Amino acid sequence: MAECLSKKIKQEETKLKKKNDTVSDIIYIIDKIREDNIMKYSCLEPYISSLIINIERGQLKLTKLEKQLTREEYLQLMSYIFYGCICITKETSTVAPTVENVDEKMHKRNFVKMNKWLTNLESFGNLSKQGDVYKGYFLGKEVVLKKPKKNFFLENTLKDYFNGIKCINSLRMECPMFAYTLGILTIETPSERKKLDEIWLVTEFIKGKTLKEMLKCNELSFKEFLDIFAQILVALEIGQNKYKFCHYDLHTDNVIIVPITNNYTCHVHVYDINVKTKFMPVMIDYGMSSSSLEKDISIGQHKIEDNGIFPYLFPGYDPYVFLLFCRDVSNVSIKSGINHLFKFYGDIDHIDYVSTLKNNTGRQTPLLFLEYIIKTYPQLSMDFTPRTIMTKSLLFKTPSMMMADLFLNPNEKESISSCFNNELNNGFIYFMLECTRNKLWFGKDKNMLTMSSYKKMISHDLKFLQKFISFVHEEKNNWSERIDDLQCAVNLLFLMKQLKIYDFKPYREWIDKFEASEMYSWYKSNKPYIDRCQRLK
């Protein structure tokens, strides 16, 4: 009797802890959403009047800048304009608004109707227990709107939005296999007693078929499936490395397959990966996902740990469970190929996936699986070459620059923040970075400084770089303890290659010396396993 009572008390304590953890997560999420809103509003504020006038007249065409921007920059611009539209619309609002929309005294007569910027809503996709999905047009561009049904899914929607703006959108800048989150808005709906505010999530529209549909209709060969899976591993590795991201709901309905005609490149570990496939997978629906923006803080689901879904990163979960889902709906050929892929995990039983994950399977990172595939399947439609890019988004236009281009002020320049720290601010690397971002280096202003100025900047960089050369010659036993410093040196290597300053002798000598060092060789071999240990903490 006492044992049963003790067990019941323990269960209640566990429930209470999960409830408290969920509340803490929501408070943290709301704070981060408010931070994002403040940042967006500060960028938009100078252009509010122009935004209202252009929308009222039907003159705001996002296509105006579409050809001048990368796809990722264009999506970022859309998200800022979307927030601006919410601010100037009385019948809707957003979560954690920074101001009461816009100052009503200033714009008393100038609020716009929502149907001026969000139109043609229609039901879209398959029926879902979680809620309804709609397709609509935001200023002429297709978007997806998700409306949750119950309180649990309302919590999921907030987490989906948080993961989107704080994690996924940043990953989308580096890798096209994530769907961009544009915004969240409240829509007032009448009920029997009172009007209720529903929270709707708005995301990028991905044009393609679900992986489930393609597998069921036998539209993929095993090689094409393998190319798709390898791309998903690349995306998951980028997500885990940057934000300890775990999708936790990566079934075949949550992967959209997009036909592509052009190659694209991603950057993982020490590789530039040139992808040359017919199909690109895009992962959607991040309400169940876990992510970590700050050390020792992880946001995720607290209520379904019995199903193997945790509020923190479980490195091997997504690839393994994804393959199980695919095997269930595949034809004989692909099913046989998936069984062969399972050899990566060794001789294990795949029936009870939760217990299997708790063993060796859950400890395997996407990068380790990807390297296994590279060795085992030479027919993979990817080229792996030495890495030359630190981060794609480094050279993208800022939202402020894009807003200035859109609203009447094309000459505004935006100062960029430091790449690493203040030690680089006065050097040639930082100068090149700022020139490239502001498109100054390629025109008539190329020789804007004197030779003595260039020499002074290069000298400043060399003093900073010399610290890392001395680090190279340290004892081998210290390398694992100084992995953060080593990662900084590797990032500098990729940055200098990205800025194409190899032709400058001082930088070329540093690059050659660093790449030839035993320490860099050690990094390439050991970093994946160090990452695995850190992700399992």
Swiss-Prot record:
One Pfam family name from the record?
Haspin_kinase
**What PROSITE patterns is this protein classified in?**
PROTEIN_KINASE_DOM (PS50011)
- Residue span(s) of domain Protein kinase: 119-429
Please tell me the species this chain comes from: Invertebrate iridescent virus 6
SUPFAM superfamilies for this protein: Protein kinase-like (PK-like) (SSF56112)
Protein's UniProt keywords contain Transmembrane helix: no
Q: Which PANTHER family match?
A: INTERLEUKIN-1 RECEPTOR-ASSOCIATED KINASE (PTHR24419), SERINE_THREONINE-PROTEIN KINASE HASPIN (PTHR24419:SF18)
Active site (catalytic residues): D249
Q: Which UniProt keywords apply?
A: ATP-binding, Coiled coil, Kinase, Nucleotide-binding, Transferase
Annotated InterPro entries: Kinase-like_dom_sf, Prot_kinase_dom
**What does the similarity note say?**
Belongs to the protein kinase superfamily.
Cite a single GO BP annotation.
intracellular signal transduction
Stretches assigned to coiled coil: 1-74
What is the stated purpose of this protein? Probable kinase.
Q: What Enzyme Commission number(s) apply to this enzyme?
A: 2.7.-.-
Positions annotated to bind ATP: G125, N126, L127, S128, K129, Q130, G131, D132, V133, K146
Q: Please state what the protein is called.
A: Probable kinase 439L
User: What is a single molecular function from GO for this protein?
Assistant: ATP binding
